Regions:
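Acidic helix-start/capping segments at beta-turn-to-alpha-helix junctions
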Residues: 36-56, 146-156, 191-201, 243-246
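Short helix/loop segments within enzyme catalytic domains
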Residues: 167, 174-202, 229-243
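C-terminal soluble interaction/assembly domains
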Residues: 313-408
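Post-HExxH zinc-binding segment in Zn-dependent metallohydrolases
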Residues: 135-192
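Pan-zinc metallopeptidase signature
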Residues: 200-333, 341
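Short pre-active-site segment immediately N-terminal to the catalytic Zn-binding motif
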Residues: 108-126, 160-164
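Active-site recognition of the HExxH zinc-binding catalytic motif
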Residues: 27, 123-140, 169-173, 225, ...
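Auxiliary, metal-adjacent structural segments of Zn-dependent hydrolase domains
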Residues: 18-117
């Protein structure tokens, strides 16, 4: 393991500003980065946070976008179609966020209903100050962390963006833990007890997919950054900001990042004309290894889901909906590292489908299986490719299938 730089610990400060200044100097020493410009910081109450988040939601996450996200997650059996996603996320972020840095405004806030920073606020400041250092040295906006779509990298998939978030949060979490390690044992215990005693009723009742997506950048991101740090110190972590991970697969398997195992590009044809009147596309993107695992975990044990998702090479999904008829279509095209990995996924997905429908396939042929219930699921595989189609009836799936030829 790499040795950690040990900056001198400042004398106990007497005001909130002095406290934060002292933490900033300590974090700069621990992280090996110095602030290069001015910034704004402030304490914000829970009530102010909710007002701020509500304004951000209204500006950047419309009811239409939330509805599309809900329908997409519903197509993967991860949310009910009528789940109030937008309102729930506002409640969740208000409850969960202890502080945040805004790369667009270069401001960061620590959430507290007190004027003097306690142990939670001090540790949160260390985490958020790391984000400021990241932004000043590596430009978080250029990496995609912005509400301005014009400034985001083009063609950056949701999976790649989640991988970048894991890098950013993993780095800040490692730095936060290094800061904690410099505190007296009594203060570390005080912090842990404060964290454990924080009520989280909204998080506790959140659908599993939301909990998993919220924690992935911190848990898996920390493991990824820790791996980089142990291999090459802060130089390796800094290099990852200049050459960010391309997929959640690279986060979950750091050796694939080191080998630059890039995702296989997969494309799908437009299907609106094929589907006919009343249908529109809700979403098209890359699912990625992480969300593929989350999807499988709805009906499979975690270890089986992890094994089935490992070996992911690339994918593309599309969700189309006919809201008037209450119908949806899921298309998921998966490319695997090799035929054996594809076969392992097929075996696991057959078990998933059997649990979803309560029975085995209605029809089978070499390289394909079809389940029939209140909707129809068609699974096809050939070499290292797997195609999954689920929709309201077989006739529609047949038309869609005719538009998606297997690679030769």
């Amino acid at each position: 393991p790499r040795s950690i730089p040990t900056p001198s610990t400042p004398a106990p400060p007497s005001t909130a500003d002095q406290t934060f200044d002292a933490i900033a100097r300590l974090v700069e020493g621990l992280r090996g980065l110095k602030a290069t410009g001015p910034y704004t910081r402030a304490l914000m109450t829970q009530a102010e946070l909710r007002a701020y988040q509500k304004k951000k939601f209204e500006e950047n996450y419309t009811p239409e976008e939330a509805r599309r996200d809900t329908l997409t997650l519903a197509a993967f059996d991860l949310l009910p179609r009528d789940f109030p996603l937008r309102d729930f996320l506002l409640d969740l972020y208000t409850e969960q966020i202890a502080g945040f840095y805004d790369p667009d405004t270069k401001q960061f806030f620590v959430i507290s209903d007190r004027t003097a920073p306690g142990i939670l606020e001090r540790v949160t400041f260390a985490h958020e100050y790391t984000h400021l250092l990241q932004d000043q040295h590596f430009d978080l906006v250029a990496l995609g962390f912005t509400d301005d779509e014009r400034k985001r990298p083009k063609d950056l998939s949701d999976d790649a963006m989640l991988a970048r978030r894991a890098l950013v949060e993993g780095d800040a979490t490692l730095t936060q833990l290094l800061y904690l390690s410099r505190l007296p044992p009594a203060e570390r215990r005080q912090w842990w007890e404060a964290v454990q005693s924080q009520p989280s009723p909204v998080f506790d009742r959140a659908p599993r997919v939301i909990r998993e997506e919220l924690t992935f950048p911190y848990d898996q991101g920390f493991a990824f950054v820790q791996h980089l740090f142990e291999e090459g110190g802060w130089e390796a972590v800094n290099a990852a900001f200049r050459d960010p991970p391309a997929s959640t697969e690279q986060i979950m398997h750091p050796e694939k990042y080191r080998l630059h195992e890039a995702p296989i590009r997969v494309s799908l044809p437009p299907l609106t004309d094929t589907l006919g009147s009343g249908w529109h596309m809700a979403d098209e993107n890359v699912l990625g290894e992480f969300f593929l695992k989350v999807y499988l975990e709805e009906r499979l044990a975690t270890d089986q889901a992890e094994r089935a998702a490992a070996g992911w090479g690339g994918d593309r999904y599309a969700v189309y909906v006919n809201e008037g008829a209450g119908q949806d279509l899921l298309v998921l095209w998966l490319a695997w590292d090799n035929a054996d990995e594809a076969a392992e996924f097929v075996e696991a997905y057959r078990a998933y489908a059997a649990k979803r429908y309560g029975h085995g396939p209605a029809r089978e042929a070499p390289g394909q299986a079809t389940w029939v219930g209140t909707d129809v699921l068609r699974l096809e595989w050939q070499d290292a490719h797997v195609l999954l189609l689920r929709g309201p009836n077989e006739a529609l799936l047949q038309r869609v299938r005719a538009r998606i030829p297997f690679p030769r």
